[in-house]
Design a protein with these regions (language model features):
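Hydrophobic beta-strand positions in extracellular immunoglobulin-like domains
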Residues: 54, 70-72, 118-120, 136, ...
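Short flexible loop/turn segments that cap and initiate beta-strands
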Residues: 64, 72-103, 192-229
Length: 230
């Protein structure tokens, strides 16, 4: 993935305490597996329910960071040692294709949560739709589940595809910032090559040149822009 910088934001919980002459009570924040996440939907089979989450509880065209966990329907417990892969597929009227996606890994410091990303390069419409197939293994037993997922068009364009000078198709997606500000913005983009309709590997050793413009004010640019490198 093409990366300029990573910016990490940490939310620090504070410990509140109160005291009286008789006792002292300390209240600590309750931290759960799903802090900061909202459910998108569930994908189910006869054995498990796969819960999908992100920060706003919805998918959209472009980059989507997704967290998931697997609930056993019999025990109501969440699986802690699953190996998971996924495959999003767009069902068009004349063809099917996938999109760029990451591997799924266990979320650091979490017991039941896994995460990855999917970049939907096109939105659904009245006749064409995305589904998401999740394959996973628990205790050497393989399972699969598939469901249609809702992928509307994004309010702002965050992904596009183009043909390179090598006649190959590429997909480029803006990952960060999610909400650009009038200031210096650290930016992260992903660049992928379409090898076939189902395979979109990360492109290495490319530079992404940027040229921000303000069309409503004489199409001016901005100062001190730096091209993106890996």
């Amino acid at each position: 993935m093409k990366i300029l910088k990573y910016t990490f934001l940490f939310l620090l919980g504070t410990m509140l305490s109160c005291s009286s002459d008789d006792d002292t009570t300390t209240t600590q924040p309750i931290v759960t597996e799903l802090d900061g996440l909202n459910k998108i939907q569930e994908i189910t089979n006869d054995t498990h329910s796969i819960e999908l989450y992100n920060t706003n509880g919805a998918l959209e065209q472009g980059y989507n960071g997704i967290s998931l966990r697997i609930k056993n329907k019999t025990t109501n417990e969440y699986e802690q040692n699953a190996t998971i892969t996924w495959n999003p597929v767009m069902h068009m009227t004349s063809m099917m294709h996938s999109c760029p996606k990451s591997e799924i890994v266990k979320t650091a410091t979490k017991e039941t949560l896994y995460n990855g990303f999917i970049i939907f390069q096109m939105a659904q419409n009245e006749t064409e739709y995305w589904d998401l197939k999740v394959d996973y293994t628990i205790d050497n037993v393989a399972y699969t589940a598939t469901a249609v997922v809702n992928v509307p068009a994004s309010a702002k364009q965050r992904v596009t595809s183009f043909t390179g000078s090598d006649s190959k198709r590429y997909i480029i997606a803006m990952i960060e910032p999610n909400t650009p500000k009038v200031a210096v913005n650290d930016m992260t983009f992903g660049l992928f090559k379409m090898e076939n309709m189902m395979t979109f590997p990360v492109v290495d050793n490319f530079k992404i040149k940027i040229d921000p413009r303000m069309p409503s004010m004489g199409n001016h640019s901005s100062p001190n822009n730096v091209d993106l490198t890996q």
